[in-house]
Regions:
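Catalytic machinery of carbohydrate-active enzymes
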Residues: 1-301
Length: 301
């Protein structure tokens, strides 16, 4: 096959999963510098790829439209003929589109998902780029405006998740924030509107000044806020992956998940998990110690 000029990239849906596929897309763009990239994903992945400089077209999958919506999507994609198609989802779409060469996802549950995705394009993992989220100038400006002037060392907390078994108690986050506050100028909470129910519990237990941004920002402005933060501490959710992708120090508190496969990818991404995978058994003092040890903060400040 000659150098591909048209490449179709089929990504995933959940925020964290999408972030973990970005090294594949970035590497393909490095190899095939003159190629046109089209991407298939859902509304969340479309937002994450909004400012990606080498994407030509985005095909949005919408489960709510059912079979006819899927059929229409296939027809639209089949109107084009691709030199290469890479499918990291494996829901059958790869077999319905037209492409000279096709790569499917690798089945290996013993390695990290970022590495597994990368192996699908037959590249050695030592060439794997970092995960990435693309932000524009306005998102960065809007994020900076939210932080009081003079505050530079920001601690961002992600106190929600999409499953109750993944949620560390809000009062524990408050205790941790109290322990860490002398190392930071300001504390803020990020998340979607569903996470607001945890904020009153945090507020009562913490008692200090903080900014609640849950449900107030779009995904990319939230990413820009996290990028402006020195450290992100949160539950096993997409926000931890976003933090790592914008090169912010990241610490994840795991419940029943599998850190060896799904932890945020990056050299400054750390995590903790109870041996029985019961998140409520992880005490704030333990998280504090691990954060201090991981990132070298001074306990005597």
């Amino acid at each position: 096959m000659s150098q591909p000029k048209k490449i179709l990239f089929i990504t995933l849906s959940n925020i964290g999963d999408v972030v973990l596929t970005t090294p594949v897309l970035i590497r393909l763009a490095q190899i095939y510098k003159n190629a046109r990239f089209d991407v298939v994903g859902d509304q969340r992945s479309e937002m994450l790829f909004k400012h990606c400089p080498f994407i030509n077209k985005f095909y949005r999958k919408d489960k709510s439209k059912g079979f006819m919506g899927t059929l229409n999507l296939v027809r639209r994609i089949r109107a084009d003929h691709y030199d290469l198609a890479v499918d990291l989802r494996s829901d059958g779409l790869l077999y319905l589109i037209r492409a000279d060469k096709k790569f499917n996802k690798v089945k290996n549950n013993n390695i990290h998902s970022a590495e597994k995705h990368f192996l699908s394009i037959k590249q050695p993992t030592n060439l794997m780029p970092k995960t990435e989220i693309w932000l524009n100038k306005q998102e960065k400006i809007d994020a900076r405006k939210l932080i009081p002037k003079g505050y530079k060392r920001i601690l961002a907390l992600g106190i929600g998740a999409n499953s109750e078994h993944k949620i560390w108690p809000a009062q524990f986050f408050a205790e941790l924030a109290s322990m860490l506050q002398k190392n930071f100028d300001f504390i803020l909470i990020v998340g979607d509107s569903r996470d607001n129910k945890f904020v009153p519990i945090f507020k009562e237990a913490y008692g200090g000044e903080f900014l609640n941004l849950c449900g107030k920002l779009d995904l990319l402005t939230t990413a820009a806020v996290i990028k402006n933060s020195e450290l992100f501490v949160g539950n096993d959710s997409g926000l931890g992956h976003i933090a790592s992708a914008v090169q912010t120090k990241t610490f994840t508190i795991f419940g029943p998940g599998e850190p060896h496969r799904y932890r945020p990818w990056g050299e400054e991404s750390y995590w903790v998990q109870d041996k029985q995978k019961i998140i409520q058994e992880i005490k704030p003092a333990l998280v504090f110690k691990k954060v201090m040890d991981a990132f070298g903060y001074d306990d005597e400040q």
